[in-house]
């Protein structure tokens, strides 16, 4: 079986930043911080810190205009992997933030004593510690949190703006320029089955990890 999970997580931008220059960065798996917590029964939970500090673990630097880079955004993306029988407490978020626990692997997770269904998203109280327990098997979950922008959202296909007029303009821009110019001859270029890991940045710099 294919045990690969892919998540496409979108962070909205404030209206003032909707038209900033695009930016790309790569978070290599070996560079992403991980925190390990062992409970009283000897079970170790691993928290992968993709965004938002956890204990003393600081995440990698997000793109400069990302909402995650703004002071006070309270953005966190944590991947929590727990073996059967493990217990772990997560620190509170801000009182104005939204926090969701997405259980995507396993079905024996308790949140503060309440059993939640597998493959489900669960909104939790943000500003108190969160106690997670893997009661009947190993589980994996995403913790997603952040302070809402409190701005209108207009969305159509892959376009997310603040007003319908901005959506129409974004579609026109795409039709005219293909996201600023598509340099490849096909819509689905690839690098072949033998190409190792690499990242090509807008300034021409290439990172290779093999």
Predicted feature locations:
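Jelly-roll (double-stranded beta-helix
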Residues: 1-210
């Amino acid at each position: 079986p294919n045990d690969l999970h892919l998540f496409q997580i979108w962070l909205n931008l404030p209206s003032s930043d909707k038209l900033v220059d695009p930016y790309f960065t790569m978070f290599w798996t070996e560079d992403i911080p991980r925190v390990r917590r062992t409970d009283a029964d000897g079970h170790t939970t691993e928290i992968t810190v993709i965004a938002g500090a956890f204990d003393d673990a600081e995440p990698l630097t997000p793109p400069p205009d990302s909402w995650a880079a703004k002071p006070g955004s309270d953005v966190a993306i944590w991947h929590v992997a727990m073996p059967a029988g493990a217990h772990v407490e997560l620190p509170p978020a801000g009182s104005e933030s939204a926090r969701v626990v997405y259980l995507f692997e396993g079905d024996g997770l308790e949140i503060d004593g309440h059993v939640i269904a597998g493959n489900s998203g669960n909104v939790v109280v943000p500003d108190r510690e969160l106690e997670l327990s893997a009661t009947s098997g190993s589980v994996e979950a995403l913790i997603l949190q952040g302070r809402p922008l409190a701005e209108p959202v207009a969305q159509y296909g892959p376009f997310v703006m603040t007003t319908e007029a901005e959506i129409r303009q974004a579609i026109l821009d795409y039709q005219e320029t293909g996201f600023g110019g598509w340099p490849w001859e096909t819509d689905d270029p690839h690098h072949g089955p033998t190409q190792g890991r690499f990242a090509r940045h807008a300034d021409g710099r290439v990172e290779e990890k093999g």
